[in-house]
Amino acid sequence: MRRRRPLLTLGSLMLMGLLAVPVVDARAWELQGVKSITATTRDNQRIALGSVRFEPRGDGRVAFTVSLEPARFTDHFLSMKEFKCLDGPGEVVCHVPYPHAQPGTITPDDLAWLEHNLLFLYQLPTDFGAKLWNGLYFQLEPTEQGLRGRPQAIDLNYISAPSDTPGQPPYQPEQRDEIAPGVRWIESLTIE
């Protein structure tokens, strides 16, 4: 009569235990459907700004449409132009629509055109006129829940005229500067 080896029995039990674990759907967040755009302030207030609709295409690109919620913004007439703005404590942050034609598509590895649709400027409530050199660019990075962007400093005068290369997003990393946490009222944008 053969005796069972305890190690083999222990190994069999471990294998059975692993097989009994339920299968979990581990799909990552997808660039598909309607997602919410939310700003988080330095005092952890979350402000729903609107939504973005993602529509995958068959070629690996994803078409997008950004829709900001007008009721969340106040109108400011700056430098002969109307801006949609958020009034914060000590800082006004205004959306700056990208002013030139662009493809309206992204890929999972290149979110630049979406980032260019989420440009903002900031200024003091007492400032007169748009301070276009006070631009904010939110470089988006994937998270488990969606996309998150921290502000980077840009000069919005850079896009006052159309680019010589219209198919390439103008704000490349060399046109952007990091901003220390806590300096700007809007600390991050999320798309979830």
Q: PLM features: residue spans?
A:
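N-terminal secretory signal peptides that target proteins for export/translocation
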Residues: M1-P6
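Acidic, glycine-rich flexible loop segments
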Residues: W113-G146, Q152
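Predominantly extracellular/secreted and cell-surface proteins with exposed
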Residues: G60-G129
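Tryptophan-anchored aromatic micro-motifs
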Residues: W29-G50, V62-L68, V92, T143-I154
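A short, structured loop/turn motif at beta-sheet edges
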Residues: A28-E30, E55-V62, K84-E91, Q139-R148, ...
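Bacterial N-terminal signal peptides
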Residues: T9-V21
